[in-house]
Amino acid sequence: QNTFATSFEQVAHRVTCLQDPKLPGIPFHMLRTDIAGNISKRFSLSGIEIPRYGGACPRWNVYSAFTRPGVIQAAVSKMTNGEKYVCIARTVEKGVGRFGQSKSILSIGLGCEAKYAKEFVYTENLDISDKKTEIPIGVSCRTCDRLDCSQRAFPPLHKKFDVDINTRGVSIYVNDDNSK
Protein backbone atom coordinates (compact mmCIF):
# COMPACT_ATOMS: atom_id res chain seq x y z
CA GLN A 1 0.00 0.00 0.00
CA ASN A 2 2.68 2.54 1.00
CA THR A 3 5.09 1.39 -1.70
CA PHE A 4 2.64 2.30 -4.44
CA ALA A 5 1.11 5.36 -2.71
CA THR A 6 -2.38 3.89 -2.79
CA SER A 7 -5.18 3.76 -0.25
CA PHE A 8 -6.59 0.64 1.39
CA GLU A 9 -9.69 1.01 -0.77
CA GLN A 10 -7.64 1.26 -3.99
CA VAL A 11 -5.71 -1.90 -3.13
CA ALA A 12 -8.93 -3.78 -2.30
CA HIS A 13 -10.53 -2.56 -5.52
CA ARG A 14 -7.53 -3.57 -7.62
CA VAL A 15 -7.12 -7.09 -6.22
CA THR A 16 -10.83 -7.64 -6.81
CA CYS A 17 -11.17 -6.18 -10.30
CA LEU A 18 -7.84 -6.73 -12.00
CA GLN A 19 -7.99 -10.51 -12.10
CA ASP A 20 -7.50 -12.44 -15.29
CA PRO A 21 -9.81 -15.48 -15.41
CA LYS A 22 -7.10 -17.38 -17.32
CA LEU A 23 -4.52 -16.90 -14.58
CA PRO A 24 -4.53 -18.42 -11.09
CA GLY A 25 -5.38 -16.14 -8.23
CA ILE A 26 -7.73 -15.62 -5.35
CA PRO A 27 -11.25 -14.61 -6.42
CA PHE A 28 -12.09 -11.79 -4.01
CA HIS A 29 -15.22 -9.86 -3.20
CA MET A 30 -15.20 -6.23 -2.09
CA LEU A 31 -17.77 -3.79 -0.80
CA ARG A 32 -17.81 -0.25 0.50
CA THR A 33 -20.46 0.93 2.93
CA ASP A 34 -21.26 3.94 5.03
CA ILE A 35 -22.16 3.85 8.71
CA ALA A 36 -25.88 3.80 7.83
CA GLY A 37 -25.40 0.52 5.97
CA ASN A 38 -25.70 1.89 2.44
CA ILE A 39 -23.53 -0.08 0.01
CA SER A 40 -21.90 2.25 -2.50
CA LYS A 41 -19.48 -0.17 -4.16
CA ARG A 42 -19.78 -3.93 -4.67
CA PHE A 43 -17.79 -6.52 -6.61
CA SER A 44 -18.09 -10.26 -6.12
CA LEU A 45 -15.77 -12.71 -7.79
CA SER A 46 -15.73 -14.97 -4.72
CA GLY A 47 -19.33 -16.06 -5.15
CA ILE A 48 -20.69 -14.33 -2.04
CA GLU A 49 -24.01 -12.65 -2.65
CA ILE A 50 -23.89 -8.92 -1.95
CA PRO A 51 -27.29 -7.20 -1.81
CA ARG A 52 -28.03 -4.95 -4.73
CA TYR A 53 -30.60 -2.86 -2.89
CA GLY A 54 -30.44 -1.91 0.77
CA GLY A 55 -27.83 -2.93 3.28
CA ALA A 56 -26.23 -6.29 3.93
CA CYS A 57 -26.51 -8.45 7.02
CA PRO A 58 -25.49 -6.42 10.10
CA ARG A 59 -23.28 -9.32 11.22
CA TRP A 60 -20.84 -8.77 8.33
CA ASN A 61 -17.56 -7.47 9.71
CA VAL A 62 -17.69 -4.55 7.25
CA TYR A 63 -20.14 -2.99 9.75
CA SER A 64 -18.33 -3.91 12.97
CA ALA A 65 -15.24 -2.18 11.53
CA PHE A 66 -16.88 1.13 12.47
CA THR A 67 -16.38 0.22 16.15
CA ARG A 68 -12.57 0.21 15.71
CA PRO A 69 -11.71 2.85 13.09
CA GLY A 70 -8.54 2.29 11.08
CA VAL A 71 -7.96 -1.25 12.40
CA ILE A 72 -8.08 -4.20 10.01
CA GLN A 73 -10.44 -6.82 11.42
CA ALA A 74 -10.53 -10.39 10.13
CA ALA A 75 -13.44 -12.81 10.45
CA VAL A 76 -14.71 -16.17 9.26
CA SER A 77 -18.26 -15.73 7.96
CA LYS A 78 -20.66 -18.60 7.33
CA MET A 79 -23.63 -18.08 5.02
CA THR A 80 -26.99 -19.81 5.51
CA ASN A 81 -26.15 -22.24 2.67
CA GLY A 82 -23.00 -23.38 4.55
CA GLU A 83 -20.45 -21.54 2.41
CA LYS A 84 -17.59 -20.04 4.43
CA TYR A 85 -15.66 -16.89 3.62
CA VAL A 86 -12.70 -15.16 5.22
CA CYS A 87 -13.24 -11.43 5.30
CA ILE A 88 -11.30 -8.39 6.39
CA ALA A 89 -12.72 -4.94 6.94
CA ARG A 90 -11.34 -1.51 7.78
CA THR A 91 -12.64 2.03 7.89
CA VAL A 92 -11.31 4.76 5.62
CA GLU A 93 -11.82 8.52 5.70
CA LYS A 94 -12.91 10.44 2.62
CA GLY A 95 -13.02 14.17 2.08
CA VAL A 96 -10.91 17.18 2.85
CA GLY A 97 -11.98 17.86 6.42
CA ARG A 98 -12.04 21.65 6.19
CA PHE A 99 -13.08 23.74 9.16
CA GLY A 100 -16.78 23.22 9.78
CA GLN A 101 -16.96 20.19 7.48
CA SER A 102 -16.62 16.62 8.58
CA LYS A 103 -14.94 13.83 6.67
CA SER A 104 -16.96 10.86 5.52
CA ILE A 105 -16.09 7.60 7.22
CA LEU A 106 -16.64 4.49 5.12
CA SER A 107 -15.87 0.83 5.67
CA ILE A 108 -14.17 -1.37 3.09
CA GLY A 109 -14.76 -5.12 3.16
CA LEU A 110 -12.58 -7.60 1.26
CA GLY A 111 -12.89 -11.37 1.34
CA CYS A 112 -12.64 -14.72 -0.39
CA GLU A 113 -13.81 -18.30 0.01
CA ALA A 114 -12.37 -19.98 3.11
CA LYS A 115 -10.50 -22.51 0.97
CA TYR A 116 -8.09 -19.68 0.03
CA ALA A 117 -7.44 -18.66 3.65
CA LYS A 118 -3.83 -19.89 3.67
CA GLU A 119 -3.05 -17.58 0.75
CA PHE A 120 -4.66 -14.54 2.38
CA VAL A 121 -2.12 -12.93 4.74
CA TYR A 122 -4.65 -11.28 7.04
CA THR A 123 -6.15 -14.62 8.05
CA GLU A 124 -2.98 -16.25 9.37
CA ASN A 125 -4.19 -15.86 12.98
CA LEU A 126 -7.68 -17.24 12.27
CA ASP A 127 -8.48 -20.89 12.92
CA ILE A 128 -10.69 -21.62 9.91
CA SER A 129 -11.55 -25.11 11.16
CA ASP A 130 -12.83 -23.90 14.56
CA LYS A 131 -16.62 -23.65 14.27
CA LYS A 132 -16.71 -21.36 17.34
CA THR A 133 -14.98 -18.59 15.39
CA GLU A 134 -17.52 -18.65 12.55
CA ILE A 135 -19.90 -15.71 12.43
CA PRO A 136 -23.28 -16.81 11.07
CA ILE A 137 -24.31 -14.27 8.44
CA GLY A 138 -26.91 -13.88 5.74
CA VAL A 139 -27.28 -11.68 2.70
CA SER A 140 -29.83 -9.31 4.24
CA CYS A 141 -32.63 -9.59 6.82
CA ARG A 142 -35.38 -9.86 4.22
CA THR A 143 -33.76 -12.87 2.52
CA CYS A 144 -32.19 -14.57 5.55
CA ASP A 145 -33.26 -17.97 6.91
CA ARG A 146 -31.80 -17.31 10.39
CA LEU A 147 -35.07 -16.65 12.21
CA ASP A 148 -33.36 -16.59 15.62
CA CYS A 149 -30.90 -13.82 14.69
CA SER A 150 -30.69 -11.21 17.44
CA GLN A 151 -29.90 -8.51 14.88
CA ARG A 152 -32.88 -9.10 12.58
CA ALA A 153 -34.28 -5.73 11.48
CA PHE A 154 -36.96 -6.93 9.04
CA PRO A 155 -39.14 -10.03 8.70
CA PRO A 156 -38.15 -12.52 5.98
CA LEU A 157 -40.05 -12.19 2.71
CA HIS A 158 -40.07 -15.92 1.97
CA LYS A 159 -41.42 -17.28 5.28
CA LYS A 160 -44.47 -16.74 7.41
CA PHE A 161 -43.38 -14.71 10.37
CA ASP A 162 -45.68 -14.20 13.34
CA VAL A 163 -45.18 -11.17 15.53
CA ASP A 164 -46.33 -11.57 19.12
CA ILE A 165 -47.20 -8.13 20.47
CA ASN A 166 -47.12 -9.54 24.01
CA THR A 167 -43.48 -10.60 23.75
CA ARG A 168 -40.67 -8.17 24.32
CA GLY A 169 -37.26 -8.50 22.70
CA VAL A 170 -34.45 -6.58 21.05
CA SER A 171 -36.77 -6.03 18.07
CA ILE A 172 -40.36 -6.92 17.24
CA TYR A 173 -38.95 -9.60 14.92
CA VAL A 174 -36.81 -11.28 17.60
CA ASN A 175 -37.93 -13.06 20.74
CA ASP A 176 -35.26 -12.86 23.47
CA ASP A 177 -35.87 -16.52 24.32
CA ASN A 178 -34.75 -17.57 20.83
CA SER A 179 -32.08 -14.99 19.99
CA LYS A 180 -28.45 -16.01 19.77
Stretches found by the model and what they are:
Residues 1-147, 151-180:
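Conserved binding/catalytic microenvironments
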